[in-house]
Amino acid sequence: MAYGWNGCGMGVQVNGSNGAIGLSSKYSRNTELRRVEDNDIYRLAKILDENSCWRKLMSIIPKGMDVQACSGAGCLNFPAEIKKGFKYTAQDVFQIDEAANRLPPDQSKSQMMIDEWKTSGKLNERPTVGVLLQLLVQAELFSAADFVALDFLNESTPARPVDGPGALISLELLEEEMEVDNEGLSLKYQSSTATLGADAQGSVGLNLDNFEKDIVRRDKSVPQPSGNTPPIAPPRRQQRSTTNSNFATLTGTGTTSTTIPNVPNLTILNPSEQIQEPVLQPRPMNIPDLSILISNSGDLRATVSDNPSNRTSSTDPPNIPRITLLIDNSGDVNSRPNHAPAKASTATTSTASSNNLPMISALNISKGSRETLRPESRSSSSSLSKDDDDDNDGEEDGEEEYPDAFLPNLSNSEQQSSNNDSSLTTVTGTSGDNSFELTNDSSSTSNDDYACNIPDLSELQQ
């Protein structure tokens, strides 16, 4: 028997039978796997890649097997061959997995396993197509076994078990025809159609009335009105009066809210204003009413003197200072430096009414009073001593007149600075007149600066 390079020949048994194989087969059972074309190996590897079937095939390959004696159909005695052990272990399977991870994703692990197996071992140990087919049947990989039998060897598919996972599953469609019983569509199920007339007999419509509508009359307990009397509408509750009253209430509150502007109410500081102004007058938006700050202090003092027993009543807010006491006549303040006896006569009344409040009106000094003080400071040294004594007397009177005032006397500071400058003439050796003129010029300038920085509180009385 002559074999070609691909192992093709005549007289090869197929599944134990003496059947002849035509020239159409590619390979024989004795053809080594390293002689099979790469395209066929690739197609076989694609089948073994499903569900990692190559692992199962690699785990059952016997060690030291004589492939020339086991290549024939039914010549492989698997239990006797595995006594020598298996060719590959789990470590070898793990190495193939690690090698496949370093390769491109399209690389087949089954193809790597076949490439390693077909080139390993000696001449009689390298696998053949016949050994591959028998090992696939032993591993119950019947899809790959059918591919090798049909495409490689042109043989019939190997026998499969009757039951189990390897049993043959028929994928042929049923060709039986089902008979339809049309007797059930007889006219006995359409009793009402015959009563529709001759026109309904030739109708082919699907929306036909095939039912017997028997209306069941039921006696209802609700009394039915007679046909002559018209129906009477049920009485309804009239809510118009309540609605109108609610609407009027809402309207009244709406108008009240619109008339009252968003202005802070400062009348609580002065209870007399609440009596004098019972009705709120419309004021500009966001402008506080400062008129309560400018009120007649004489009215308040008269009210306090007339009602000494009602000082703790609920009309006067507790712990609220009377701001109107701060606003006095600026003309009286201007006349204080020139009329000392008048100050002494009014000291007791102002002290009683001050109530530990600073006399801010003392700052409101007109320019005329300041100018009258300047010629006195520019007089000779003899007149300065006299003015000094007068000012000291004025200081004592001022302290008695304003015991609670903590404001500095600008005239005293001006004259004290002039005295200090005149005393410096004895140290520097300069004339007293020259140094006094320079000092008075500087002091007058400083007084002008103080006059500019003093706010004019008389504007609150406008």
From Swiss-Prot:
Gene3D superfamilies cross-referenced by the UniProt entry: Death Domain, Fas (1.10.533.10)
Record's compositionally biased regions (Basic and acidic residues): 368-377
Segments of skewed composition (Acidic residues): 387-403
Sequence repeats: 262-269, 286-293, 319-326, 356-363, 453-460
Any single GO BP term: larval somatic muscle development
Subunit structure and binding partners: Interacts (via Death domain) with pll (via Death domain).
Name of the protein described by the UniProt record: Protein Tube
The species this protein was found in: Drosophila melanogaster
Name of the gene: tub
